[in-house]
Amino acid sequence: MIPLVLEESGGSERVFDIYSRLLRERIIFLGEQVTSDTANRIVAQLLFLEAEDPEKDIYMYINSPGGSVYDGLGIFDTMQHVKPDIHTVCVGLAASMGAFLLAAGTKGKRSSLRHSRIMIHQPLGGARGQASDIRIQADEILYLKERLNTELSERTGKELETIKGDTDRDFYMSPQEAVEYGLIDLVLDKKPVKNI
């Protein structure tokens, strides 16, 4: 169930779901696995907020175990495409594609709450069918692995070989370790946005 928020102004009352109310304050919340529905919603929100005010920053709070690489890359590309700076904030867990999107925020504006966890690893996948079909899928997963590792290398300042080694298996970090790694820029104790 999605909580509702009652807002009173000028003698009238309006009811919003909490996510719509947060969006009015330029806050996007990714609190689930990355799927095509999730990606379509977040891409639409990013484009809407850019159209509303291309000069005003956007805040994206992330609590996600990851999900679809293709859908996550759609969000990532849109984050790079829109004009506003994007603050990313890890709340709870940013794993796999969640961590990738956390690192995709504007440099200097990527953060985490202090008890969150961040995890990077290589893309997961599987294939069935004829040998030639399996080969096609394997080649695609290797391509995606290289693409994600290259982006992480650029965003963290780490050598590509270091990223490849670290993402070979699940690699968990505390927020402070993620700062040292270059995935984020600061650990938050205070709220980075105005009261809503």
From Swiss-Prot:
GO BP, one annotated term: protein quality control for misfolded or incompletely synthesized proteins
Subcellular locations according to the entry: Cytoplasm
Protein name in the entry: ATP-dependent Clp protease proteolytic subunit 1
Domain of life: Bacteria
Signal sequence coordinates: none
EC number(s) on file: 3.4.21.92
Subunit field text: Fourteen ClpP subunits assemble into 2 heptameric rings which stack back to back to give a disk-like structure with a central cavity, resembling the structure of eukaryotic proteasomes.
NCBIfam families: clpP, PRK00277.1, PRK12551.1, PRK12553.1
PROSITE patterns named among the record's database cross-references: CLP_PROTEASE_SER
Catalyzed reactions: Hydrolysis of proteins to small peptides in the presence of ATP and magnesium. alpha-casein is the usual test substrate. In the absence of ATP, only oligopeptides shorter than five residues are hydrolyzed (such as succinyl-Leu-Tyr-|-NHMec, and Leu-Tyr-Leu-|-Tyr-Trp, in which cleavage of the -Tyr-|-Leu- and -Tyr-|-Trp bonds also occurs)
Keywords for this protein: Cytoplasm, Hydrolase, Protease, Serine protease
